[in-house]
């Protein structure tokens, strides 16, 4: 892969770390801010909703700016937002800082996806997207477990200061390696051309399958710390090593999903979403058995991130050249709306007394909705192709 794609991977690592790090710090944050664990979990939902709002707004506002300039501005927002998190004197400040940080997220991955696919041959586009998203998997593999350990040893604020330093490093790498001209297009795209993508049914279906397909993961992953400690029975010190196992699964799934999508996008979409639903059902069955739970958490990581490149490429293809940046950013927002939906659904499940053990079952049901939407979308493709192939009467 070109060095510029690897630079985008570095930025993705920083953003991925700040998104997911709170999941390993929920108990510490809840205790320090004097709120319940479900209320602390809303910090995840707040971040996700900030991505959902910020992605389309910033994408449209920056559509005429050079792509590299946009990427650097977003990394600056990210870095300042994490510093604000570390300084938060109360829950409300922390929530506001998380939302500020989140504004950079969707547009960075949206613009980054367009830049990454512009740097490689057409048959390597999904792999280029997957390479950039390796930053997210490494963030989960190393950043989140490190954050959980760092928070346990030095406090959750120190973990956010560490992420701030990561942001500075990522800014420098993107500035040094990403070309100034890549991804800018031959001519500026008008606002009407960009927004017109929202009228395409396949784009909207693609966004919906991303929301529901990914929400299932976050029903479980948002509450992974209390699940492992309070239900499965692991000591708190075991959470970081288990998150390393999950992160290893994400890394495997991310690469596998890119390769599968390059070989056949439709099969990759259906196969990965179906696998994710099946693994979640399996996790529900073995959650009380420690060794089996660890094995299923590894498989959960593989299945979850195998969906990323197929879902992102599906929306890019449906959008076409004129709407690809907005559609790409909106799909990142859709991932995070799924994050918020999953965190909310998990919190409701807990608050209604169904218990932590019910979370994987709820998650599997939500993911199944994403699978049904994918099947519907592909059926529409076949119908449209058949109509186009019929000669006019």
For each feature predicted by the language model, list its residue ranges.
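Paired small-residue
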Residues: 6, 77, 81-84, 92-101, ...
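Helix-breaking motifs and short loop linkers at transmembrane-helix boundaries and internal kinks
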Residues: 34, 66, 87-93, 233, ...
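Conserved MFS/SLC helix-loop-helix module at the cytosolic interface between two early adjacent transmembrane helices
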Residues: 53-92
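Helix-to-loop junctions at the C-terminal end of transmembrane segments
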Residues: 55-66, 253-265, 351
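Helix-loop-helix hairpin linking two adjacent transmembrane segments in secondary transporters
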Residues: 91-93, 121-127, 131-176, 227
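Cytoplasmic helix-loop-helix junction between adjacent transmembrane helices
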Residues: 97-135
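Intracellular juxtamembrane helix-capping segments at the cytosolic ends
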Residues: 108-120, 306-320
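C-terminal transmembrane helical hairpin of 12-TM major facilitator-type secondary transporters
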Residues: 267-311
